[in-house]
Amino acid sequence: TIFQVDLTYKNISDFAKQNGRLVPISPQNAQWNVIKDYNDEHKDQPIELTSAESFQVSDAYAWVLENRYDAYFDIKLSFEKAVTDKDGAYHQYADKLTWFPYKGIPTYPLLHRDSKNEEFSKEYTKAIKELKEDGTLEKLSKKYFGEDVFSYVDK
């Protein structure tokens, strides 16, 4: 999430090149690793990564609006619910805040390890592979998210 005034940030590389100030992230958060990985791949132009134990999401939006920080690493669905949705808590700032994608954070189902779930796990993995190969996952993603969210996940 960035302040509309800062539209010179078209992507994460622009943000890094212009020494953008990122709202602190908890090291336990998957978003921390996304920025850490970016920095590892772009040692010549890293993003300053500051840790935070916890804060309210509402604080992050306020900090960006107050220009204390240039961006808040927000998940698209959270941004849409809070800002773009007409009933969102920050919808009154929809003309002042914007968002751009960078990378998907892979998620995985967690299954209890036992003999019953071992077979289920194999069948689940097989089914997901088939759905990916036949284009069903992409179609469902476009239907429900308006885009292929799988394209953001590193292969």
Question: What are these language model-derived features?
Answer:
Residues 87-126, 147-155:
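Periplasmic-binding protein-like
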